[in-house]
Amino acid sequence: INWLKLGKKVSAIL
C-alpha cells in the first residue's frame, strides 16, 4: 500500500 498516495487521496476528500 502506498501511504503517500493514500494520504493525498484522503486529503483531497477532506
From Swiss-Prot:
Keyword field: Amidation, G-protein coupled receptor impairing toxin, Mast cell degranulation, Membrane, Secreted, Target cell membrane, Target membrane, Toxin
Where Leucine amide occurs along the chain?
Answer: L14
- Annotated compartments: Secreted; Target cell membrane
Annotated Gene Ontology MF terms?
toxin activity
Q: Would the keyword Glycoprotein be found if you checked this record's keyword annotation?
A: no
The disulfide bonds in this chain are none
For this record, the Gene Ontology CC terms, alphabetical, are: extracellular region; membrane; other organism cell membrane
List the InterPro entries.
Mastoparan_peptide
Tissue expression as described in the entry: Expressed by the venom gland.
Q: Name one Pfam family in it.
A: Mastoparan_2
Task: Write out the function statement from the record.
Answer: Mast cell degranulating peptide. Has hemolytic activity. Its mast cell degranulation activity may be related to the activation of G-protein coupled receptors in mast cells as well as interaction with other proteins located in cell endosomal membranes in the mast cells.
Q: Which family does it belong to?
A: Belongs to the MCD family. Mastoparan subfamily.
Name it: Protopolybia-mastoparan-I
Provide the species name: Protopolybia exigua (Neotropical social wasp)
